[in-house]
Amino acid sequence: MGYALITGASGGIGRELAALFAADGHDLVITARSQERLDMVKTKLEQRFGVHVVTFAIDLSEANAPKKLHDFTTSQGIAVDQLVKNAGFADWTDFLDADWNRQNEMMQLNMHALAELTYRYGRDMRANGHGRILNISSVASMMAGPYMAMYFASKAFVRSLSEAVAHELRGTGVTVTCVCPGPTTTGFQKAANMSGRNFFTMTKPATARQLATYAYRRMMRGSTLAYHGPLTKAGALAERVLPRALTRRIAAFMDGGKPHTLKV
């Protein structure tokens, strides 16, 4: 059994997924920006499950970070046969009033890093004839999202890329699973600077553990695309039957509407 590599593993969904892999006896490579938080997760998992946990603190939004991570695992002789891309963030803002550095960081983390890690580790898995890849997308992948334009676009990228690569890897022993969750209690709302009435206050968010358990099961089944929660399933239906102009209005309302304070 090879290692499971999980990005964004210091908290939330990533930490819960790490625990699920460890419970099934998988050794782990866990990454996030904070070494201190990674060390805490490592200690708990090793003590509870008796697995080996390797930590690698890295900011995957930085240039060449995915290659650095792949070079590290390769140099350590770590064979990764389970890859989970969970790291990502959003920002509640008018697109033209956004901080461009933050928007660019979002593109790098949500799209570029995910794609490059899929490419590098996917090639290794294909050469070995087995492996699983899990990409966390969102209900946001199903429509355009005014006031969170870049985030919605990035999650549409994740879903499209995942489905296409899953098709290309048929018959190789490697599967790609894309899970689209709805609101989940992970600190997303605070990190995105959201306030007022929005999809977190208008719905009952899933817990990180609930979403992680669902995603883990779907990954192990080799599902290509999976929708978690009633809001996401409603979004999938809306994508098929409603006019795009209407879904944009719905998304803008659910995102909390126009931010009151412009960011420059």
Would you name each region that the model predicts?
Residues 10-11:
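Conserved glycine-rich cofactor-binding loop
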Residues 24-40:
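Conserved glycine-rich Rossmann-like NAD(P)H-binding loop of the short-chain dehydrogenase/reductase
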Residues 86-91:
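Conserved NAD(P)H cofactor-binding loop of Rossmann-fold oxidoreductase domains
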Residues 94-107:
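Substrate-binding pocket helix/loop in short-chain dehydrogenase/reductase
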Residues 118, 154:
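Active-site helix of classical SDR
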Residues 138:
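Residue(s) in the substrate-gating loop at a strand-loop-helix junction
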Residues 178, 199-235:
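C-terminal helical subdomain
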